[in-house]
């Protein structure tokens, strides 16, 4: 018996050791060293072809990028389960998409769901699988030849190959990579790999300067030309190792590409543009060539948005062709009124430059209420676009992509992601908590076609003029004339119901003073002459459909606290407003648009966008007149209104944290807790002080509620992609 137990134990240990060697280290023995690899996908000139029914057929990428975010979770939680993926895959294919792009190895639930969804399906979904590069590695002292960059990228790339072939187990992983048992072979639906992230230009430049002699690579599958830079030689090695590994272990090949974007695009712009935008590096995959052992092919992958960086808007149109080094026809890149479509022109430059297929693997616009950048020519902005406008912009972008001669593109992104951050709101929020609330001011959270709206099945309020969801329990303060203010809130908005008998909307001006912090505020408004029962930090002014806005006391203006030098040229910390200053200001966001500064670098301040200006409309997604950017609506004697938390200087409503006084010992934005705010209702011209009532606030911590909703943009893109115009 003892011998039997020992034998069984030994066998189990051997099996475990074999499992670890094969599924965790990538070890293999090439049993068919002379076998030629096969491929079902290849490039032919600037097109991609798939082999179907024994014939090569042209394939155009109609793709969607998919992230890992869910409300209440960070990207690194990998919280999306198999059933959710299956539901999403069906919705994506019903929209007319044929490809999903992911950025890194996801949890095993994704691959199990992908396998199950495609099984027996005549028209499957295809996958573009990515390999991520750690953000710290790209933004540190390391160069691209550091083992933590180059070798780690190689290791992750080979691991990715095992994952899609169902031959890997990952129990402990980096935070940018999922884990699990990867036992499903989905390789028959993986058309290609996209290696890397958006390259940091300083890392590329640093690598090239540090290793000028390492600008050549000669491999079995890839080699560099004489014009290659060291960073490109590093990429060639990574790609060569990928092709060699998959060809030897699995006798297969598929397409490959390296991530790129405008910041490191291959063009040499005029000196003034290069200097102004500090463009210090290029990555050109034309310097990486394939040997005759490559049966699949290489494509050029770009993240390209209409508004970023939009270099061509600063280059004279007569010089556009010179960037490609050949004559390029841009005649269809001008509107009838002469306005250039610099996005289409840029895409045309890319296809003119490259000899391989060009795939725009990221393009999109955001439905967030906030904005970070305006598109100068086409109006496809980074933020503050309605869901309908988003859909129209996506269709226009895809048309530009195809008319420029690209092999397709992938929309960014499938779902909204609450954990995301944006450079022009990062100063205003607690970035350790943004996964637990929906910040409508942060545009980066709202690029998705799928929204996660607050509430388990529906939101607590829809601003549409129907006040049936309001009750007496919501009343904060009421007045002798029957007027009242009621409030609710959820993970995205503070909602207000303003009731006033005999309301003459648009003919009288209503004012709501709001007191959020005891550190600042004023009981008197210099501009209106109104007096308040408490020191108000904000003033909500309702003048009608076109001229209603939220104002902030100048001392509590978050833009000034972080960007006054950029916008006004003044340092307000040297001479801050008084704590009880009676001045109220409009609320603005700083933008990245550079036109004014580029034209007159010495005199122009940064451009801003009035985010406190309120938009009238119906915010109920169930209604035909739905406007996702609508802030308020009037019906009879009632006004319904919603304000995003950050607009009222909440840094983390999940724990009810707001901004402290910027100037009293903080020298910047710090956070303090609050348990209530005060609100009142008055009108321009009244002489008596406006009484204010208290409204209790209680955070929800890490427990969030949300429900999925397909945006209007989904329907618009679906009609385009399935209606015969999606190519």
PLM regions and their residue ranges:
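Aromatic-rich peripheral "rim/lid" segments of glycoside hydrolase catalytic domains that contact
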Residues: 371-380, 386-389, 400-476, 710-727
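Surface-exposed, glycine/proline- and aromatic-rich loop segments on solvent-exposed faces
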Residues: 476-597, 655-684
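Aromatic-lined substrate-binding rim segments of carbohydrate-active enzymes
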Residues: 81-153, 158-159, 238-254, 336, ...
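Active-site groove signature of glycoside hydrolases
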Residues: 134-139, 143-146, 157-229, 250-262
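Short, well-ordered beta-strand segments enriched in hydrophobic/aromatic residues
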Residues: 465, 492-501, 637-645
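Active-site-adjacent substrate/metal-binding segments within catalytic domains
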Residues: 28-119
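Glycoside hydrolase catalytic-domain groove-lining segments
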Residues: 256, 278-377
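N-terminal Sec-pathway targeting helices
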Residues: 1-16
């Amino acid at each position: 018996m003892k011998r039997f137990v020992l034998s069984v134990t030994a066998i189990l240990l051997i099996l475990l050791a074999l499992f670890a060697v094969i599924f965790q280290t990538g070890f293999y023995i090439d049993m068919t060293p002379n076998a030629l690899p096969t491929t079902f996908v290849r490039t032919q000139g600037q097109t991609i072809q798939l082999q179907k029914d024994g014939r090569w057929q042209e394939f155009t990428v109609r793709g969607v990028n998919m992230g890992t975010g869910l409300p209440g979770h960070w990207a690194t939680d990998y919280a999306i389960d198999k059933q959710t993926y299956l539901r999403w895959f069906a919705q994506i294919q019903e929209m007319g998409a044929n490809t999903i792009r992911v950025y890194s190895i996801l949890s095993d639930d994704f691959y199990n769901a992908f396998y199950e969804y495609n099984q027996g399906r005549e028209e499957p979904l295809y996958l573009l699988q990515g390999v991520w590069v750690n953000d710290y590695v790209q933004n540190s002292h390391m160069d691209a030849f550091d083992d933590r960059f180059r070798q780690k990228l190689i290791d992750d790339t080979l691991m990715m190959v095992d994952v899609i072939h169902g031959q890997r187990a990952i129990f402990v992983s980096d935070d940018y990579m999922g884990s699990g048992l990867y036992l499903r072979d989905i390789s028959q639906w993986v058309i290609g790999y996209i290696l890397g992230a958006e390259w940091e230009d300083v890392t590329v430049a640093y690598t090239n300067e540090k290793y000028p002699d390492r600008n050549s690579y000669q491999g079995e599958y890839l080699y560099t030309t004489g014009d290659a830079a060291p960073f490109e030689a590093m990429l060639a090695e990574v790609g060569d190792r990928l092709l060699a590994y998959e060809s030897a272990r699995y006798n297969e090949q598929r397409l490959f590409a390296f991530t790129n974007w405008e910041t490191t695009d291959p063009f040499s712009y005029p000196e003034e543009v290069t200097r102004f935008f500090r463009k210090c590096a290029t990555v050109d995959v034309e310097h990486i060539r394939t040997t005759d052992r490559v049966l699949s092919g290489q494509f050029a992958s770009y993240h390209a948005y209409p508004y970023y960086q939009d270099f061509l808007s600063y280059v004279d149109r007569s010089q556009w062709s010179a960037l490609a080094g050949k004559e390029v026809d841009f005649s269809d890149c001008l509107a009838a009124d002469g306005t250039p479509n610099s996005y289409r022109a840029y895409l045309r430059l890319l296809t003119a430059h490259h000899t391989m297929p060009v795939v725009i693997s990221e393009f999109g616009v955001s439905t967030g209420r906030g904005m970070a950048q305006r598109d100068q020519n086409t109006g496809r902005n980074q933020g503050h676009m309605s869901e309908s406008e988003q859909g129209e912009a996506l269709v226009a972008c895809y048309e530009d992509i195809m008319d420029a001669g690209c092999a397709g593109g992938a929309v960014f992104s499938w779902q909204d992601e609450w954990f995301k951050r944006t450079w022009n709101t990062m100063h205003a929020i607690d970035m350790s908590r943004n996964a637990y609330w929906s910040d409508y001011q942060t545009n980066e959270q709202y690029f998705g076609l799928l929204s996660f709206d607050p509430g388990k099945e529906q939101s607590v309020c829809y601003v549409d003029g129907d006040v049936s969801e309001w009750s007496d329990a919501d009343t904060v303060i009421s007045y002798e004339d029957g007027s009242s203010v009621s409030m609710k809130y959820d993970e995205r908005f503070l909602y207000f119901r303003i009731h006033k008998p005999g309301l003459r909307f648009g003919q009288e001006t209503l004012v709501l003073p709001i007191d959020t912090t005891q550190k600042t505020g004023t009981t008197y408004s210099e501009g209106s002459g109104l007096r308040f029962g408490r020191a108000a930090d904000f003033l909500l002014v309702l003048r009608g459909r076109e001229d209603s806005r939220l104002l902030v006391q100048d001392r509590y203006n978050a833009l000034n606290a972080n960007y006054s030098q950029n916008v006004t040229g003044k340092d307000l910390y040297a001479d801050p407003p008084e704590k009880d200053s009676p001045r109220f200001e409009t609320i603005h966001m700083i933008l990245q648009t550079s036109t004014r500064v580029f034209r007159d670098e010495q005199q122009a301040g940064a451009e801003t966008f009035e985010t406190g200006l309120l938009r009238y409309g119906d915010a109920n997604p169930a209604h035909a007149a739905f406007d996702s950017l609508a802030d308020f609506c009037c019906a009879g004697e009632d006004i319904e209104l919603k304000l995003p938390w950050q607009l009222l200087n909440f840094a983390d409503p999940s724990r009810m944290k707001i901004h402290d006084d910027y100037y009293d010992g903080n020298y910047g934005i710090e956070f303090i807790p609050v348990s209530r705010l005060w609100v009142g209702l008055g009108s321009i011209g009244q002489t008596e002080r406006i009484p204010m009532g208290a409204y209790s606030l209680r955070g929800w911590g890490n427990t969030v509620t949300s429900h999925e909703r397909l945006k209007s943009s989904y329907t618009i893109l679906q009609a385009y992609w399935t209606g015969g115009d999606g190519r």
